[in-house]
């Protein structure tokens, strides 16, 4: 902008001013999904650019926190408002989704005779991530195997755990 002034004697003076604006405020939001069905270990990481530092962060719902990295949360929809040093705002959102629930099934063969300890049970899991460890309980001591052999008549329980610590 330029302004000019002329006095009574006809002398002219002028001056200019340039008004600038900061770069546009933007935010990049990266979501990390929960590792197990129903887990509360998902989170978001925001990176603000432009505007005028410093930045403040407000997640919705509030349980997600007020920093660039959200608190650990479960599946759901989350909003984020970033405010720069001039009070300008930008919003973004993310959706966290549960992975499919890990599930276990058991096939078994009963003991062949009364008091025989030759029963077999085999655990199978679906929706696991990576290798699975198995722990059978109900016998004299825990069995760390996918297959339970030499089982006497009893009720047995298996706990299957994958590499994300998801269980079934």
Each model region followed by its residue ranges:
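Proline- and Ser/Thr-rich low-complexity, intrinsically disordered segments
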Residues: 1-168
């Amino acid at each position: 902008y330029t302004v000019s002034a002329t006095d009574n004697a006809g002398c002219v003076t002028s001056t200019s001013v340039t008004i600038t604006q900061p770069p546009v405020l933007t935010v990049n939001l990266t979501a990390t999904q929960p590792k197990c069905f129903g887990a509360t270990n998902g989170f978001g990481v925001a990176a603000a650019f432009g505007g005028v530092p410093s930045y403040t962060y407000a997640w919705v719902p509030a349980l997600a926190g007020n920093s660039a990295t959200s608190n650990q949360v479960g599946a759901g929809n989350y909003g984020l408002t970033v405010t720069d040093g001039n009070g300008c705002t930008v919003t973004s959102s993310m959706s966290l989704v549960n992975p499919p629930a890990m599930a276990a099934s058991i096939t078994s063969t009963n003991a062949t005779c009364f008091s025989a300890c030759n029963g077999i049970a085999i655990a199978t899991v679906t929706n696991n991530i990576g290798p699975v460890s198995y722990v059978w309980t109900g016998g004299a001591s825990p069995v760390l195997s996918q297959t339970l052999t030499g089982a006497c008549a009893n009720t047995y329980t298996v706990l299957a755990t994958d590499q994300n610590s998801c269980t079934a």
